[in-house]
Amino acid sequence: MNLFDTLPRAAESDREHLFAVADFFLALSDMTRHEGIFALDRYCYDKNDLKTGPDGAPSLPQITPPETDVFYPLIRLVVDGVESETVRDIARYLLASGDEAGGTRLSLMLGAESLCAIQIGESDRILCARMSAMMGRTLGTEYQERMDKVFDSRERNRQ
């Protein structure tokens, strides 16, 4: 499931932004694995921010435009049960129609790829490995190592 043939290179200055977007999608993935894909429906769009619904569910990591402009329509398609190939096509069109470059473009690509992975039920660890690979060797290795500690901690807490 590779949406994009080429990826922009991530710069060191993109670290926090890319990590925040990756954290956002890992939180969505974790939520959908426990509650099902329709759990995404409780998230509403308000002031360019995806936020929790009135049920008081935990907040997601913060994302802002242009990510919300691309991610929200894709999330709606997934919730509405649109075929994954159609979601992929629309993701490609949304990204092709923008003028973002560098780290911002990479964050959009990372998010679109992640949402398609969430739609098919990919595990959090595989999703993390996918996003880390997209970030490049330096940032990707750092993110993967950070998340491996989180995953290991979760597993220890479940035992």
Predicted regions located by residue number:
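Large intracellular
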Residues: 1-159
